[in-house]
Amino acid sequence: MPTATHVATEYGTLRRVAMRHAGDFTRPLTGPDVHPVLARQRATSTWTSYDPAAVRAQQDQLIGLLRDRGAEVVLLSAAPDCSAQHYPRDIAVSVDHVLFRARLNSQHRLPETDALSDPTLGLRPVDLTRGTIEGGDVMLPDTSRVLVGLSEETSPDGAAALQEALARHGVDREVVPVHFKVEGIVHLDDHLAVVAPGTALIHREVFTTDQNRWFDAHFDDLIPVTEAEARAVQVNVLAIAPTTTVVAAGSDRITTILAAHGLEVLTVDYGEVTRIPGSLRCTTLPLLRT
């Protein structure tokens, strides 16, 4: 029997999560052969070379923390020649009882999704029909909506395909496209993080005026972050329970604010991971939250 997949919100207690260690293969971040999407993304985020062994060591710190907190950590098999394989958040999204396989925007990342079909994992990923959509752009702020950021990696067609697939599988949720006012956005989760019921970190400057109004109307407490904090990927936190959030070491102001909101804040050194724009949320793919 397949293991249950169920994720209702961003902040349910984390019980089962997939991760994948960084591989030794890396891609050039500068030069004439850099993809135009990456060139645009460099305007809104910081990209520097990283040491894969150091990334793996920092991932092991997070794995230990999650296991100590009662989560089962499933390690996905390697994806050869995939420099971003340690960001499994992008390859799928769990919405309620269904795991949807992402439609990745970059050709070189496509092999990353193969691990979802490993029979030992007990997963039954559902394919979407069109467009592009990556898990870093998909958020579950509550039990009735799915936010989908229209970043460089996710298209309106991808968001529409998710809405159609939800209906086919009996998931009664509204897909809400999230609009940015600038090009070059890597993913929504570098600029918005739902950390508790009705509470989110937000980098307001990248969203349209209408989008900010929508956030104001649908969240009880929006905590603004600075441009520097967003560039340092400090928004990309991981809620592991309704009152517990993991943040990257060095996110001092954010840590203080979250603690003042009554949250337990745990820290992990992720300084090597964040040398390209991904952090705690990016390196985890929740499969079961309660």
Task: Name these PLM-found stretches.
Residues M1-T290:
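The feature marks the mature, well-folded catalytic cores of soluble enzymes
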